[in-house]
């Protein structure tokens, strides 16, 4: 019988119930929270973290319900959350309350402050309706809401709101695509974060008819004179090493990203000035070709002028793409890093307030002990001192719970922030390199288009015979220059470098080669050059190689 009872007790224990007590048992609500700051903050959440206070100053005495805890775990765990499908959709896990916000259109009549139209679907009980269509908010209202969230939620790394226009222009289709993608990503974060989901300002942001403005105007505690004064003091001791190392890294990243953006903009401005100079030079050559008496040279000058104008157009488009792909990405990354730095500074202010509260509690405790030991002090005065001590202890406990809660959430969100920043910058750099390669190929194609006109200035090969004693044959159909065995601008084969590129000799022509080369008997464009072996080149041959076009 004793073994049967022990077996029943084991089956009814929390070992087989997942390690958590049920909601009716309320066992997890009785876990005490230590008022002293721990020596180290655990990165992984535990069941003791359920009974934490609110982060908005007013501490809720009731614990976090089990349903809210499950929603928070499902949202903060990337492996449990479903991946987003498409650009504007948000996948929700489970059957709990959710909030989905999807941008349907952007009205860019006012380029400085476009209007964003959204459809909202929710099952949260506090909302008046389950579906809101064509909710209109301006870009300035988005920034007001983001400023409120940054000030009142120090436990969340709120992303920065993307700018209303790119560095190139405003109101065009490409700008709207970038803005829609950035705002949708920002709304996805706000609507899926469990710490922001039940904020009353989020409900007001959705349900306001026109002209949204936050009801609580809270200024940034790390701005103005207080921020400058706090910079003069050393940072408070930080028990969380991850966040202690994160802030200097984010600050350095913010400065370097902003500096790289400024330098890239200067480079683009100079490239655009160079492109305009190319266009002016091309027009001058076109005007000069009209006065030229030699037909071949006049045609070549005209073609070179048009080529320079085409190069100018491509350079301007290339510089615009550089601003959109890389400069705007660096600008948003620096803005986002600045917001993260501000939020980490808000945490330092909370830690300073906690240290001040502990010192005040110790002073009240010393005063109460002195009053109790003195027989001449009235009982009313002693009661007042004890009451003040109790208030100080409650305030210290609330601040301690708030700092622990903020630290735990910031450790989680810092990992997500670093990962998203790395992925976004990798994507921007990849797109930047692809666009650069595309435009450089276009420039090479434009330059190669005038090769026949340069070589056909006269019947003897034009400029292609510079530096040679003998006249080369007329070039009519030169091969493209995208080869490793020759340079089509000079049509010279390079047997001396053949071993470094491939195993075959490039001085011997192979008619079965499929790289686009032509047979010498079919195309008389090959220049007759003396073979160059492995022996030392004489200065005259080197000069011919360097001066050839």
From Swiss-Prot:
Keywords: Coiled coil, Cytoplasm, Nucleus, Protein transport, Transport. It is found in: Cytoplasm; Nucleus. Residues 96-213 form the PX domain. The keyword Cell membrane does not apply. GO terms for molecular function: phosphatidylinositol-3-phosphate binding. Residues 508-522 have a biased composition (Polar residues). Residues 470-540 are annotated as: Disordered. Residues 250-281 form a coiled coil. CDD domains: PX_Vps17p. InterPro entries: AH/BAR_dom_sf (IPR027267), PX_dom (IPR001683), PX_dom_sf (IPR036871), Retromer_complex_Vps17 (IPR014461), VPS17 (IPR053055), Vps17_PX (IPR037907). It holds the Pfam family PX. The keyword Protein transport applies. Component of the retromer complex which consists of vps29, vps6, vps35, vps5 and vps17. Plays a role in vesicular protein sorting. Required for the endosome-to-Golgi retrieval of the vacuolar protein sorting receptor pep1/vps10. Component of the membrane-associated retromer complex which is essential in endosome-to-Golgi retrograde transport. The vps29-vps26-vps35 subcomplex may be involved in cargo selection. This is Vacuolar protein sorting-associated protein 17. It comes from Schizosaccharomyces pombe (strain 972 / ATCC 24843) (Fission yeast).
